[in-house]
Amino acid sequence: MIPAHQRKNPPEESVQIVNRDNLVVGAVPRSRMRREALIHRASYILVFNTRDELFLQKRTATKDIYPGYWDVAAGGVVLAGESYEDSAGRELTEELGVTASLVHLFDHFYEDSANRVWGRIFRCTHDGPFTLQAEEVASGRFITVAAALALSRTEPFTPDGVEILRRIQEGG
C-alpha cells in the first residue's frame, strides 16, 4: 500500500469547526470549510530571531487562501481532534523545519468575506536555518515588526496577519 503522503490525491483533511464562542461544533472537509466560510480554528506561530526580528514568509501561488501574499506567521488550520498546541508544533515543523518552545500570546478572532477563524497566536525564537516547505512557503526573510507593517501598505499581506501584527505592536 502507498503511504497517504505519497499518493497523487491524498485524502482531504478534516478540520475542526467552531462557533463564535470558539466551542467545537463539528468537523468537515477542508474544502467545505473554505467553500462555506465556516468558522474554524488555526494556529499562528510568529518566529522571531534573537534580535527580535520577525520571520516573514511569502506564501506560494498554490495556497487555497491568500496565494502569493506575505504572511507573518507559520501555522494553519487545526485538524479534527487536534489541539491548538499540537497544530502549532506540527505546522512549525512542516512549514519551516523548526522545532522550538512555543509561548502562547493571545487568542484572536478574524473575519472577512473569505475567512472566519479563531486563531491562537504563539511566539518562538529561532535564528535559522529554515527548511521551507516548497508547497506552502516560497521564500522568507527576517524583518522588524514596524518594517513589516510599513511593507503591508504596499505589498499584499494576509489580512489576519496584519491585524495580529498591529495587536503585537500595541502590546498584545
Across the structure, where does each feature detected by a protein language model lie?
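Acidic, metal-coordinating catalytic segment for phosphate/diphosphate chemistry
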Residues: 2-44, 50
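Short glycine-enriched loop/turn motifs at secondary-structure junctions
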Residues: 9, 71-73, 132-136
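Nudix hydrolase/Nudix homology domain
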Residues: 24, 29-31, 80, 106-109, ...
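A short, polar/proline- and glycine-enriched secondary-structure boundary/capping micro-motif
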Residues: 36-38, 65-69, 143-144
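Active-site segment of metal-dependent pyrophosphate-handling enzymes
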Residues: 37, 51, 61, 83-85, ...
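A glycine-rich, hydrophobic loop/mini-helix early in the fold
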Residues: 42-74
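A short acidic, glycine-rich active-site loop
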Residues: 74-80
